């Protein structure tokens, strides 16, 4: 235990400092961007993705009560852990459902209660996991604890890093999966463990189920590894890696067919 603490003391200290900053800014968060409000509604409203769905498709000349708005933003006592509702809501939105499932899961422990804290704590946990993976990635690449801890501090205290944690959107989860894919590929470069291939495929799938823009990052980082494998004449590794990554991407289609309409809609979506 003492050896473990000594080995990771600098990382733990860095995470404690970052945690303090995270909770400081979280406690000072005032109000939410409209997309954050929709994140709650899409996650927690029972088969009613938009506010207008509560009023027969239109709010013109209609009044919404406070309770109706609370019902839209929170999980009800009788519809907790409603993954099917989240899935349906996202087929009517422009994003895949992964992050919304997580928020619905967390919100289901607090039915009828609206607060930013459950989502912020969830984001904080995801953020810490991303930073630990970043540490492990830099250790693999540079074999230097100093470099790894500095990378954690530089990103963990950066404006962009903290913004992903503070904003109740899918971007912090996207960051985690981005670092995870890089880490798994770096592991594969150091050790040819067969178990890494399905993990890479699952990560690609999870990334695409979180945010469609993940495809651009995944394409180029996977292409880079394919080139590396060909240069090393590791043809077996090239085939297995390519199949794993491709399977992860293709699995998006049967898992969330609505992605086709969302990606190729006539109207510009994000």
Task: Identify the residue ranges that each predicted region occupies.
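Specific aromatic-rich, kink-prone transmembrane helix
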Residues: 105, 133-136, 153, 157, ...
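Helix-to-loop transition at the C-terminal end of transmembrane segments
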Residues: 21-38, 55-60, 253-269
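Interfacial juxtamembrane loops and adjacent helix segments
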Residues: 44-95, 107-112
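Short acidic/glycine- and proline-prone juxtamembrane loop motifs at membrane-interface regions
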Residues: 166-171
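Loop-to-helix entry region of an early transmembrane alpha helix in multi-pass inner-membrane enzymes
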Residues: 88, 92-101, 109-129
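Transmembrane-helix signature of polytopic, membrane-embedded enzymes
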Residues: 117, 134-157
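Start-transfer (signal-anchor) and selected internal transmembrane alpha helices
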Residues: 1-23, 27
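Perimembrane helix-loop-helix junctions
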Residues: 182-199, 204, 216-250, 261-264, ...
């Amino acid at each position: 235990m003492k050896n473990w603490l000594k080995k990771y003391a600098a990382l733990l200290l860095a995470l404690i400092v970052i945690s303090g900053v995270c909770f400081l800014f979280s406690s000072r968060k005032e109000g939410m961007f409209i997309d954050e409000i929709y994140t709650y509604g899409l996650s927690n409203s029972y088969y009613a993705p938009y506010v207008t769905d509560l009023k027969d498709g239109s709010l013109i000349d209609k009044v919404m009560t406070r309770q109706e708005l609370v019902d839209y933003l929170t999980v009800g006592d009788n519809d907790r852990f409603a993954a099917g509702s989240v899935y349906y809501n996202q087929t009517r939105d422009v994003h895949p459902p992964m992050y919304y499932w997580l928020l619905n899961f967390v919100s289901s422990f607090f039915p009828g209660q609206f607060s930013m804290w459950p989502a912020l704590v969830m984001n904080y946990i995801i953020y810490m996991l991303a930073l630990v993976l970043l540490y492990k990635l830099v250790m693999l690449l540079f074999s230097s604890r100093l470099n790894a801890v500095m990378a954690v501090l530089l990103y963990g205290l950066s404006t962009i890093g903290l913004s992903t944690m503070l904003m109740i959107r899918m971007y912090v989860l996207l960051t985690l999966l981005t670092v995870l894919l890089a880490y798994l590929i770096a592991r594969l470069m150091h050790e040819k463990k067969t178990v890494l291939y399905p993990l890479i495929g699952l990560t690609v799938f999870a990334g695409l189920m979180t945010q469609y823009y993940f495809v651009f990052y995944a394409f180029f980082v996977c292409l880079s590894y394919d080139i590396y494998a060909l240069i090393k004449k590791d043809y077996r590794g090239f085939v297995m890696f390519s199949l794993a990554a491709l399977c992860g991407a293709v699995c998006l289609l049967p898992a969330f067919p609505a992605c086709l309409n969302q990606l190729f809609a006539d109207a510009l979506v994000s």
